[in-house]
């Protein structure tokens, strides 16, 4: 059929040419038909005629010679174009050069695909200047060359031919470009005389698919006389690359219960062969599915796109009934459009069946029991639930709620993140005497909402029965802490207060005894029976055991239980001040030069441990002695300070000045004390206070004092 089509195309073209040239009856040297269209067959068969070429030099065609651009073809003497071997790829065109003693010409054979026949016929019937008009001659004919990759030796191997219309006498061909004199060098070469192009080693289309060379014709001296013209060499792809999956790992997810035909993922492979040929035309197939239940054909892969889709019903796509939620598919990609001769590559697709919340959590039993001692807090029971959904997801994680029986908010429940159990805790201590039993109603839900048409049922609620055990609780003081105000220095044995403690265990009718637990100053005692607290020592507000006027003591209340329980009470005594401390004077030592110009010796201050109004203003006075009053005096500065002033310069010596200071308390308290005054000699900024004359001066003062007393 293909041969008939070729003949039809050639016949039509020849008829058109004959019609176009019918008026020209003179012989025109050359090919009588210059353009041919033939349909690309699956293969050109060796020695089978392809078409007939008619050449006439109008002189008898003596010494007629034909040259074909592709060395796999030749033209017989009768003009028949034949293949020298079986040829599956001849390119898009063949050029035939014919030469005799009197004429030469070029014919072009265009090879078209089956889908191009219509366009070829249109070209044949197109009325244009090319019909009947001799084609312009080409000086160098360099038709494209096609070379299959991965050819086997021997090399070099002839792959094409360059033709010069003028012949090559006195001239030679020269080839240049990438693959000749540029890297990679030495792949191609040309016979300088015949124009035969040869390849020297196997080619790899995936490395270089096309070579663009230049052909020139030079004279024997190397001068270019024709060209350059471009020579295209294309490497014909062979199926020498397997499909490869490069984007792994391949993991897809599909929700359980998804409709049949749900797309899970896409698997695509890469083939390094020519994408325009079947060598890279891939088809996909599932070789193996693991596991094979509930169906050995859970999934389908689109052979062209590589899309993996579900093919089972939503009922079978149930995660909870599956042997495992993970499926592994061995995917095969085969080139050559999936034909048996194609090369293959495989990869594994992992498909995970994702969970949806189609199973509510359910308690493992309807009623749980718990026992807790009164007064204790913490977890008292773990509530267990079952959920068939995927663990560690929101469809599995439980959320617990106390919906009844917790008016006092004594209980809380939280989820154990590892076990999903509900941890029920007492957060406020329970009292046996108030209630010995508690009943809680607990509800469990999921973090994620249930899917439509699924609801929480009776198994999603449970009852917890809690029994409170009685324990011997310690007595409780009322109030606690206790506060009282007392004046310091009250008589020993004075009653401070009576403490009161009660036993929470009202049903046990226990007795209570009291004792002192902590009394830092040992000032107090307590009656063990009635709780009366009395003083055993004088209360002193100025004691180091008193802080901010408060004294703190602790007492114990002990019941008669077995074993006994103890309660602790705190007593704060606020002490009121009384004037029981004399003022103190400072400083007690002063120094002055014997020739001082400023006779103001020192400023005295007074302080008192008591509180107002038992402190300042203070009264400063010299003691009632006539002798000292003649030597110095005291001037009041303010409520807390006074100044000692000399009445005259004194000789170097140590003097003791008797001074009294009195507070403002009722009654006031006076402190009689002495100020030691050192009179020193001062020379050149040095003060000498050695007491060489101190004994003399002191004795003089003593004698003067005695004399004044005697005279009285």
From Swiss-Prot:
What InterPro entries does its record include? Cadherin, Cadherin-like_dom, Cadherin-like_sf, Cadherin_CS, Cadherin_pro_dom
| Principal place of residence | membrane
Annotated GO molecular function terms are: beta-catenin binding; cadherin binding; calcium ion binding
Q: Where is the lipid attached (GPI-anchor amidated aspartate)?
A: 693
Organism classification, top ranks?
Eukaryota, Metazoa, Chordata, Craniata, Vertebrata
Protein topology in the membrane: Lipid-anchor; GPI-anchor
Q: Tissue-wise, where is it found?
A: Neural tissues. Also found in muscles; kidney and retina.
Q: What is this protein called?
A: Cadherin-13
Maturation propeptide residues: 23-138, 694-712
Q: What positions does the record give for glycosylation? A: 86, 382, 500, 530, 638, 671
**Role of this protein:** Cadherins are calcium-dependent cell adhesion proteins. They preferentially interact with themselves in a homophilic manner in connecting cells; cadherins may thus contribute to the sorting of heterogeneous cell types. May act as a negative regulator of neural cell growth.
Q: Which biological processes are named by the entry's GO terms?
A: adherens junction organization; calcium-dependent cell-cell adhesion via plasma membrane cell adhesion molecules; cell migration; cell morphogenesis; cell-cell adhesion mediated by cadherin; cell-cell junction assembly; homophilic cell adhesion via plasma membrane adhesion molecules
Q: Which domain of life is it from?
A: Eukaryota
Q: Which residues form the Cadherin domain?
A: 143-245, 246-363, 364-477, 478-585, 586-680
A Pfam family for this UniProt protein?
Cadherin
Signal sequence, renumbered to the chain: 1-22
Of the GO CC terms on this record, one is: catenin complex
Give the location in the cell: Cell membrane; Cytoplasm
Q: What is known of its domains?
A: Three calcium ions are usually bound at the interface of each cadherin domain and rigidify the connections, imparting a strong curvature to the full-length ectodomain.
Q: How does it assemble?
A: By contrast to classical cadherins, homodimerization in trans is not mediated by cadherin EC1 domain strand-swapping, but instead through a homophilic adhesive interface which joins two elongated EC1-EC2 domains through a region near their Ca2+-binding sites to form a tetrahedral, X-like shape.
Originating species: Gallus gallus
> What keywords are assigned to this protein?
Calcium, Cell adhesion, Cell membrane, Cleavage on pair of basic residues, Cytoplasm, Glycoprotein, GPI-anchor, Lipoprotein, Membrane, Metal-binding, Repeat, Signal
């Amino acid at each position: 059929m293909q041969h008939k089509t070729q003949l039809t195309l050639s016949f039509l073209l020849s008829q058109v040419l004959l019609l176009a040239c019918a008026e020209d009856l003179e012989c025109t040297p050359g090919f009588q038909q210059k353009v041919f269209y033939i349909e690309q067959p699956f293969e050109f068969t060796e020695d089978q005629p392809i078409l007939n070429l008619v050449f006439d030099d109008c002189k008898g065609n003596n010494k007629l010679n034909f040259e074909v651009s592709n060395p796999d073809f030749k033209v017989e003497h009768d003009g028949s174009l034949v293949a020298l071997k079986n040829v599956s790829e001849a390119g898009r065109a063949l050029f035939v050069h014919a030469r005799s003693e009197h004429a030469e010409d070029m014919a072009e054979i265009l090879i078209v695909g089956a889908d191009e026949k219509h366009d070829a016929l249109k070209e044949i019937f197109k009325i244009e200047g090319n019909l009947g008009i001799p084609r312009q001659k080409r000086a160098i004919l360099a038709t494209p060359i096609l070379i299959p990759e991965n050819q086997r030796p021997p090399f070099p191997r002839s792959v094409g031919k360059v033709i010069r219309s003028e012949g090559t006498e006195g001239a030679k061909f020269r080839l240049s470009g990438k693959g000749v004199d540029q890297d990679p060098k030495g792949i191609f070469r040309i016979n300088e005389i015949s124009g035969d192009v040869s390849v020297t080693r196997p080619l790899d289309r995936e490395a270089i698919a096309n070579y663009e060379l230049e052909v020139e014709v030079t004279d024997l001296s190397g001068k270019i006389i024709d060209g350059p013209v471009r020579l295209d060499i294309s490497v014909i792809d062979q199926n020498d690359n397997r499909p490869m999956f490069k984007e792994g790992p391949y993991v897809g997810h599909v929700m359980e219960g998804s409709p049949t035909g749900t797309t899970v993922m896409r698997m695509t492979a890469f083939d390094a062969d020519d994408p325009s040929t079947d060598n890279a035309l891939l088809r996909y197939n599932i070789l193996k599915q693991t596991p094979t239940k509930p169906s050995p054909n859970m999934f389908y892969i689109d052979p062209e796109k590589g899309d993996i889709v579900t093919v089972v019903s939503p009922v079978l796509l149930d995660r909870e009934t599956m042997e495992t939620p993970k499926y592994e598919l061995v995917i095969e990609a085969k080139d050559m459009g999936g034909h048996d001769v194609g090369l293959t590559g495989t990869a594994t697709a992992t498909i995970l069946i994702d969970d949806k919340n189609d199973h509510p959590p359910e308690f493992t039993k309807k009623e749980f029991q718990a026992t807790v001692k009164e007064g204790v807090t913490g977890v008292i029971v773990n509530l267990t639930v079952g959920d068939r959904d995927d663990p560690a997801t929101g469809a599995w994680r439980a959320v617990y709620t106390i919906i009844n029986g917790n008016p006092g908010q004594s209980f809380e429940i939280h989820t154990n993140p590892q076990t999903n159990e509900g941890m029920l805790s007492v957060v406020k201590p329970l009292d046996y005497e108030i209630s010995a039993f508690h009943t809680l109603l607990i509800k469990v839900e999921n973090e994620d909402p249930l899917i439509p048409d699924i609801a929480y049922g009776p198994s999603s609620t449970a009852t917890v029965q809690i029994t409170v055990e009685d324990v011997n609780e310690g007595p409780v003081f009322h109030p606690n802490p206790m506060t009282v105000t007392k004046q310091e220095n009250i008589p020993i044995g004075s009653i401070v207060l009576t403490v009161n403690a009660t036993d929470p265990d009202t049903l046990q009718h226990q007795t209570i005894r009291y004792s002192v637990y902590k009394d830092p100053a040992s000032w107090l005692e307590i009656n063990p029976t009635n709780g009366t607290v009395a003083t055993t020592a004088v209360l002193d507000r100025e004691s180091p055991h008193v802080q901010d006027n408060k004294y703190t003591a602790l007492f114990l209340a002990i019941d008669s239980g077995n074993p006994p329980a103890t309660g602790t009470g705190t007593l704060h005594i606020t002490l009121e001040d009384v004037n029981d401390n004399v003022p103190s004077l400072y400083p007690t030592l002063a120094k002055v030069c014997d020739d001082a110009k400023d006779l103001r010796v020192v400023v005295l201050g007074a302080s008192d441990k008591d509180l107002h109004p038992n402190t300042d203003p203070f009264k400063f006075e010299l003691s009632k002695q006539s002798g000292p009053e003649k030597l110095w005096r005291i001037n009041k500065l303010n409520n807390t300070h006074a100044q000692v002033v000399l009445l005259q310069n004194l000789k170097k010596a140590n003097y003791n000045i008797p001074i009294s200071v009195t507070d403002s308390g009722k009654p006031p308290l006076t402190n009689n004390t002495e100020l030691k005054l050192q009179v020193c000699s001062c020379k050149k900024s040095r003060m000498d206070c050695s007491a060489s004359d101190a004994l003399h001066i002191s004795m003089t003062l003593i004698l003067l004092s005695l004399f004044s007393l005697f005279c009285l």
